Amino acid sequence: GIRPTQGMVKQAIFNLVGPRIEDAHVLDLFAGSGALGIEALSRGAAGVTFVDHQVRGLAILRQNLDVLGLKERSHVVRGDVVRWLEASPDQVKRAGLVFLDPPYDDVVLDQALRALDRTADDVTVVVEHSRRHEMPALARLQVDRERRYGDTIVTVFVAPAVESSTTP
């Protein structure tokens, strides 16, 4: 089903990444009804790309964006998150902030994190996951902060900017 992010956890997420939202391009992956991306838009994000494969959740999301007048700054993609990440490296590189809130499916979470890790460039990635989940080893994404709320853990990863290879 559709899992709205609980209010307390959502509040905590925005307390952790507040300053990074302004003018950022945001990816809301496994978006569901889009609670995290919509909140980011309301806090000054330049734009949000919502990606999910569930038709029902996306219908609700589109309706919410319409009612709130946020369609102009939104792009809704219906599709498999991991495949989309692998097929859209430019859009991933442009993102300054990524919300990753998959159904508690460890395999999908790890695949999405690894796909993000391959293209991560000057980005903050916020992952909501079960406290039982062991994070995979990642090359670029480094754990910045972690908060626990019952059985849910919010992990914030950061990846530094990729150094340009041009020499003066």
Model region roles, listed by residue range:
Residues 1-168:
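Class I S-adenosyl-L-methionine-dependent methyltransferase catalytic core
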